[in-house]
From Swiss-Prot:
Organism: Treponema pallidum (strain Nichols)
Highest classification ranks of the organism: Bacteria, Pseudomonadati, Spirochaetota, Spirochaetia, Spirochaetales
Catalytic machinery residues: E187 (proton donor)
Name the UniProt record assigns to this protein: Putative adenosine/adenine deaminase
Protein residues bound to substrate: H18, G157, D266
Entry binding sites for Zn(2+): H16, H18, H184, D265
Length: 299
């Protein structure tokens, strides 16, 4: 079996990350001076994760410089894992840390592109939460999309279908500015919710999407539409979306012809790089080395 060092040595993509939470805990602890008890640890779903964010991480991020420091740590830890393509979500709300100075915000992102371009290709995606005030999104989404800094859009938040029609306008804007369209669904929700989100938003990619594995028809639908699911196995286990790594549906999805990419999601919380995830999945028999090579090849 190929070693962990082999997977670390291979160039790879990380196609599902959140840029403010994608550094290793040790680096974050050194920067913030904050020790999170019993961490990283398996959690009781997103509610417990958000409790930790509210108590330990959000209070440490107050200024534009704090945001930039977090982003920088995340990018450097990705590079250390030989990530050469990083698709990473930047929440629209960080404009408030920049005192609503859009030029300053965009300039910092542009500078990150330039600073690290020899090591990694960064694809910034505009992250928008479903619980964000609509007036705020309407104020900032279009100028951010129009800037050319963002290549993708990512809608996240509660995985419920009720009221999602309210977000169609965001994806129409994304189409206007030629952004790739993503949304979080199927992490805890079912196969039909995955199909519904893909259809109503005309998604190019799904963030997670593992709920689709319970329905062969939905897997076929995703495969036929060539919709990629950006799956985060360790995150799914740590948040109790999946009982254990051995029971993760990533292989079933790949074998059904669904395009699958691999992501760390929030490295700070889940503690496994993509190299480590590949090694762990092969080691436990979840996937074969051929599956691992296919995931390494994704860009």
């Amino acid at each position: 079996m190929k070693s962990l060092e082999y997977y670390r040595s291979q160039p790879k993509a990380d196609v599902h990350t959140h840029l403010n939470l994608s550094m290793k805990y040790e680096r974050y602890k050194q920067w913030s001076g904050v020790v999170i008890p019993n961490f990283p640890r398996k959690m009781r779903g997103l509610d417990e994760m958000h409790e930790i964010i509210g108590e330990y991480t959000r209070p440490q991020c107050k200024t534009a410089q704090d945001v930039l420091n977090l982003f920088t740590m995340s990018i450097e830890d990705a590079i250390a894992d030989n990530v050469v393509v990083m698709e990473t979500s930047v929440d629209i709300g960080f404009i408030t840390h920049y005192e609503e100075n859009l030029d300053h915000f965009l300039c910092d992102l542009s500078d990150l592109h330039r600073r690290y371009k020899r090591n990694v290709t960064l694809h910034f995606e505009l992250g928008i939460s479903k619980i964000r005030e609509r007036s705020f999104v309407e104020q900032w989404a279009e100028p951010m999309m129009r800037s050319g800094i963002f290549e993708n859009i990512d809608l996240y938040g509660p995985e419920i279908s009720e009221g999602i029609e309210d977000f169609i306008y965001i994806f129409k804007l994304a189409e206007k500015y030629h952004l790739k369209k993503k949304a979080h669904v199927g992490e805890f929700s079912d196969a039909q919710s995955v199909r519904h989100f893909v259809e109503i938003f005309n998604l190019d990619e799904v963030q997670h999407g593992i709920g689709a594995a319970t329905d062969e028809n939905v897997l076929r639908f995703l495969a036929e539409r060539k919709v990629r699911c950006n799956v985060c196995p360790t995150s799914n286990v740590m948040l109790n979306a999946v009982e254990c790594l051995e029971k993760h549906p990533i292989k079933k999805m790949m074998d059904a012809g669904v395009r699958v990419g691999l992501g760390t999601d929030d490295l700070l919380f889940f503690g496994k790089t993509n190299s480590e995830q590949l090694f762990d999945m092969v080691s436990c028999g979840l996937i074969t080395e051929l599956h691992a090579e296919a995931l390494l090849a994704v860009r």
